[in-house]
């Protein structure tokens, strides 16, 4: 019965989220879960728009909503906001959401038993793009999210490592505290925390359904800014946790998984870019590109596999040769972003820039002009 369900804290770090915060809190309050076991925490991270007023109004309506204010000079980015609230939590589980997240009503009553039964320290929900039909770029991101979930599940199935994705990550509070909370010296709290969990022997699971819905960015500039941050944080953590990852705390299968992941995601794009540059300068044919083309081809097949899987939430993009080609061409952006970020990180000192992604809710027109 309900008595068996543990206490859950749903946590959102919100900065300037007036477009989506009301919808989010209303949806969370409607989740099917024992009301005395569910608290909603919103950290208003020095918002300069109407977010604080909206939250004050929502607190009048929803008793389970707790709002924390954070001053503008608090520092630590999203991790700092999450650490602020972490000190006050008492629930067994902490579900971290972005302000643009949308959950099905049955999410918690399915997710929590899955996490408990599997013995997971954390579970990442599959991310599903809510605005896939807006343009080709949002459709490609919907494919990429399905691809990512397929790859994460595949890595787990061969004894590898699954990773947290920030939005829709369920964390067991005692495991999180044992890992030292959120790292405030990173631009990607989720990728960093994934390695903290791995190094501390805390297993991370992945759940295909129910998914968490989120907005894909609408334009190329916003995409490249977002991906630059992901690439920087993703690469930085290999240096931050390198010693732990190489130690005997990890199973050999996990170390092999991380090595393959590092070679494919970071080394190969850098080599491919250098190879292409060298070929252009010497007017010869590039030699590493066949490998890159095979990798992109396999990614294309994984996209098809993911998008054809039965799924709840927003419909995944229909699959045909043209759609697969779009997905593969789109993935090529990593072959630009990764080398660029790698060179910049090698030459410039570490600098922390939390580039906030704009969440629009239903207002896509505003973004087209932004």
Where are these regions (language model features)?
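Catalytic donor-sugar/metal-binding loop of nucleotide-sugar-dependent glycosyltransferases
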Residues: 194-212
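Long helical/loop segments within the catalytic core of UDP-sugar-dependent glycosyltransferases
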Residues: 62-71, 75-92, 105-187, 224, ...
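Membrane-embedded multi-pass helical conduit in multi-pass membrane proteins
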Residues: 1-2, 260-349
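Cell-envelope/extracellular polymer assembly enzymes that use nucleotide-activated donors
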Residues: 6-9, 39, 192
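N-proximal low-complexity "stem/linker" segments adjacent to membrane-targeting elements
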Residues: 1-26
């Amino acid at each position: 019965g309900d008595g068996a369900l543990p206490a859950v804290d749903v946590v959102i770090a919100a900065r300037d989220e007036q477009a989506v915060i009301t919808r989010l809190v209303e949806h969370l309050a409607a989740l099917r879960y024992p009301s005395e076991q569910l608290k909603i925490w919103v950290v208003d991270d020095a918002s300069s728009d109407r977010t604080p007023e909206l939250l004050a109004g929502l607190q009048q309506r929803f008793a389970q909503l707790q709002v924390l204010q954070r001053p503008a000079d608090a520092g630590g980015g999203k991790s700092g906001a999450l650490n602020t609230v972490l000190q006050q939590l008492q629930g067994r589980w902490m579900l971290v959401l972005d302000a643009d997240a949308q959950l099905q009503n049955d999410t918690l009553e399915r997710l929590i038993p899955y996490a408990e039964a599997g013995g997971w320290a954390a579970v990442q929900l599959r991310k599903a793009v809510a605005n896939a039909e807006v343009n080709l770029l949002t459709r490609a991101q919907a494919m990429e999210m399905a691809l990512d979930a397929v790859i994460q599940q595949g890595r787990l199935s061969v004894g590898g490592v699954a990773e947290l994705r920030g939005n829709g990550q369920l964390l067991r509070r005692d495991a999180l505290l044992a890992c030292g909370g959120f790292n405030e010296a990173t631009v990607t709290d989720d990728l960093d925390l994934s390695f903290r969990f791995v190094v501390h022997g805390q297993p991370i699971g992945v759940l295909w359904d129910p998914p968490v819905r989120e907005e894909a960015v609408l334009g190329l500039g916003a995409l490249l800014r977002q991906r630059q941050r992901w690439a920087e944080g993703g690469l930085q953590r290999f240096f931050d946790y390198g010693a732990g990852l190489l130690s005997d705390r990890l199973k050999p299968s996990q170390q092999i998984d991380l090595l393959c992941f590092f070679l494919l995601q970071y080394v190969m794009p850098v080599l491919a870019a250098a190879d292409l540059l060298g070929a252009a300068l010497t007017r010869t044919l590039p030699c590493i590109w066949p490998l890159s083309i095979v990798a992109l081809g396999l990614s294309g097949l994984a996209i098809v596999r993911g998008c054809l899987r039965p799924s709840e939430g927003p419909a995944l993009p229909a699959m045909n040769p043209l759609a697969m080609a779009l997905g593969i061409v789109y993935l090529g952006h990593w072959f630009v972003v990764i080398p660029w970020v790698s060179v910049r990180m090698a030459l410039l000192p570490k600098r922390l820039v939390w580039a906030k992604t704009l969440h629009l809710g239903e207002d896509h027109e505003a973004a087209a002009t932004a």
